[in-house]
Amino acid sequence: MRMLVSKSIFAEPEPGYYAHTPVSLVICAPNMPDLLSHRLEDGFRAASRHAEALAKLQYRDPNAKDVLGFQLAFSTTKSYWDYVEEDDPECGQRFSKAMRAVTVNKLGDVPKLYPFNKLVDDGGIIVDVGGGMGQVAQSILSHWHGLGLKCIVQDKFASKSGSTHPDLEMQSYDFFSPQPVKGSAAYLFRHIFHDWPDDACITILKNTVEAMNPHQSRILICDQIMEETNPSTAAVLYDIDMMCLYGGKERTLSEWEELLKAADQRLEIKNVFRSPNQVSGILEVQLCCD
C-alpha cells in the first residue's frame, strides 16, 4: 500500500488509513480490470519483443503481412485478429472486454462531438463499420433521438438478434470485403484504422469509397490525431502499443491526409472536430467531385 500511495494510486490521510483517489476509482470502473489485463498480458508481452521485430523489419513501418512483436512473443505466424479468433478465444474475450471499458469511458465523445443532425437531409443512415455490439450507435441514436436517424452496425461477429433499439440494425460484415450498404449518409469508423497498417487501411477505404454516393456520403473517422511535433506521452504510448500488437499506428493530420489520398485521390478532409485537450477527434471526409 505504501508503494501505491507513493504513486498516488491511493491516499493515506492518516497513519494506517487508506483512501481512494481518482486513479483508484478509475481502476474500479466496470471492465477496467480487463483493460489492464489486456495491456499487461498481451501488450507488455508483445512490447518485450518489439525491438527484435523492428530490427527484422530494418526499422520501417510494418505492413499487414509482417512479423511483429506480437507474433514473436506468442510464437505464431498469424495476425493478432486471426490468432484470437482461431487459437486463443480467451485472449479475444479479454480484448473485447477491454474495448468495452474504453467505449464506456469515452461513449459520450462521439455523439456530442459531431453534428449528426446534418445527416438527416442525406437520408439519415449511419453505417457503424466495425461497431462491435453497437454501444456507440445506440449512444448516437439516444443523443439525437426524434430526428429519424437510423444506424446499421457492422461487425464480423454481429448477431441480428443483438439489437434492442428499433432504429438499429446489426449486420455481419468483414470490412476487407466490398461494402454492401450503398449510398449511406455516413460510414463511421471508430478506433478502427489505428489497429491496422496503411496497406490494410487503404483496402478498407477503397471498399467504402465504392459504396459512397459521391454527392452526399461521407466517411467519419473517429481516432487519434497526433500532434505533428512533440506529441503527448499518451499518444506515443498508444502508437507503440498499436504497432507491437497489430502493426497499426496513430497518425498525424498530415498522415491521415496521405492515407486518404493513397486510397482515392478524391478523398478530402472537410472538417476536423476535436474537444479541447483531447488527442482523439473526428475527421469528416468526403469525395471531391470537380
Swiss-Prot record:
Residues of the active site: H194 (proton acceptor)
Residues reported in the UniProt entry to bind S-adenosyl-L-methionine: D155
GO molecular function: O-methyltransferase activity
PROSITE patterns recorded: SAM_OMT_II (PS51683)
Keywords linked to the UniProt accession: Methyltransferase, S-adenosyl-L-methionine, Transferase
EC number annotated for this UniProt entry: 2.1.1.-
Matching Pfam families: Methyltransf_2
InterPro entries: COMT-like (IPR016461), O_MeTrfase_dom (IPR001077), SAM-dependent_MTases_sf (IPR029063)
Consequence of gene disruption: Impairs the production of aspergillicins A and F but accumulates aspergillicins C and G.
GO biological process, one term: secondary metabolite biosynthetic process
Record-stated family: Belongs to the class I-like SAM-binding methyltransferase superfamily. Cation-independent O-methyltransferase family.
Function, as annotated: O-methyltransferase; part of the gene cluster that mediates the biosynthesis of the aspergillicins A and F, 2 cryptic cyclic hexa-depsipeptides. The hexamodular NRPS agiA catalyzes the condensation of the six amino acid residues including N-Me-L-O-Me-tyrosine, L-proline 1, L-proline 2, D-isoleucine, O-acetyl-threonine, and L-isoleucine. The starting condensation domain (C1) of agiA probably loads acetyl-CoA which is condensed on the N-terminus of threonine by the first module to yield O-acetyl-threonine. The second module then loads L-isoleucine.
Protein name stated in the entry: O-methyltransferase agiB
Organism: Aspergillus flavus (strain ATCC 200026 / FGSC A1120 / IAM 13836 / NRRL 3357 / JCM 12722 / SRRC 167)
